[in-house]
């Protein structure tokens, strides 16, 4: 489990829950971009898991490169993406690239269609 820390007024770090740190994750239809140094992939998958546990359809992809997920997690076709959404799982799409440890931006047609499916397959309305 990922621990998110927030500095208090006294400069002490205290743990913060995912829904407190990122309340928009409980709302549908958001695009999240992660920038910066280390920890992006870990945070990305934690956010994806949080979204799935809260009834969201989650599509994970990249506009540049992303560490390659285990092969069984990766979705290469729209049918695979649909199966993941129907099963209540996150879908991960991306293209192969020169670096065997990473995936690259997916083909545009797969991305656009998968993005639309993510919105249309919303299967749970969250309480407010």
State each model region's role:
Residues 1-30:
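Extreme N-terminal, non-catalytic leader segments
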Residues 37-42, 65-66, 124:
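Gly/Ser/Thr-rich loops at beta-strand to alpha-helix junctions
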Residues 116-119:
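Loop/turn-to-beta-strand initiation segments
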Residues 2-6, 24-25, 35, 52-57, ...:
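Core catalytic machinery and nucleic-acid-binding channels of phosphodiester-processing enzymes
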Residues 103-111, 124:
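Conserved mixed alpha/beta catalytic, RNA-binding, or beta-rich assembly cores of soluble enzyme
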Residues 22-52:
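Walker A (P-loop) phosphate-binding motif
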Residues 122-128:
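Conserved small/polar residues in nucleotide/adenosyl-binding loops
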Residues 49-103:
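N-terminal phosphate/diphosphate-binding loop that engages ATP/GTP or pyrophosphate donors
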